Amino acid sequence: MSDPIWKSRIIPAEQALPGRADALSPTTSHAITGREIKADTPEGMQEIFLGLGCFWGAERLFWETDGVWHTAVGYGGGTTPNPTYQETCSGATGHAELVRVVFDPEMLSLDQVLKIFWEGHDPTQGMRQGNDRGTQYRSAIYATTPEQLVAAHDAAARYQAELDGAGLGTITTEIVKAGPFYYAEDEHQQYLARNPSGYCGIGGTGVVCPIGRHAPT
């Protein structure tokens, strides 16, 4: 059993669970598109990994968005290789629950993706999101290109100004280059498509993010 302290701060790498050599590869197809869950990113499209609380509801935000080609959920940002859901929820892996978002930048700009991200959760809550508490629920942007990193930091600064104006707190979102991404088990992929009345714990601040207002040209 993990120490409860790792629910409120990320466990040091040397204390994290050892994990396993073999990946827990999903075997089902995407419930919305029918594509393989681990589908490669097509040429010309972009991939980004986003953490905004429980990945069940977070994934739905993106598969419902025009211009998003593919989504999948998994774990990243921590230490333990090939973790399970239970291990991640224990706080002993250091991972966040993430959504892999693959989008067509000719239909949906990066700023529009980030706008959905910022407005879709409360990025000021640290190691929790609403009633969901633990390091796995932290706000995170794991970028796959230098351009994404720059855009994410710029968007964070602009959104912080709006949050300040609304009297809200400081953004705690982790914005870094993406590391390994580990796919979650079958039952978590497109969970709310397979379980329409299932739990969705995410919710935004109500503050509009002043980016991504125009379609790509």
From Swiss-Prot:
One of its GO terms (molecular function) is L-methionine-(S)-S-oxide reductase activity. The keyword rRNA-binding does not apply. Pfam families: PMSR. Keywords: Oxidoreductase. Its EC number is 1.8.4.11. One of its GO terms (biological process) is cellular response to oxidative stress. GO terms for cellular component: cytoplasm. It comes from the Bacteria. It catalyses: L-methionyl-[protein] + [thioredoxin]-disulfide + H2O = L-methionyl-(S)-S-oxide-[protein] + [thioredoxin]-dithiol; [thioredoxin]-disulfide + L-methionine + H2O = L-methionine (S)-S-oxide + [thioredoxin]-dithiol. The active site is at residue 54. The keyword Translocase does not apply. Belongs to the MsrA Met sulfoxide reductase family. Has an important function as a repair enzyme for proteins that have been inactivated by oxidation. Catalyzes the reversible oxidation-reduction of methionine sulfoxide in proteins to methionine. NCBIfam families: msrA. This is Peptide methionine sulfoxide reductase MsrA. The gene is msrA.
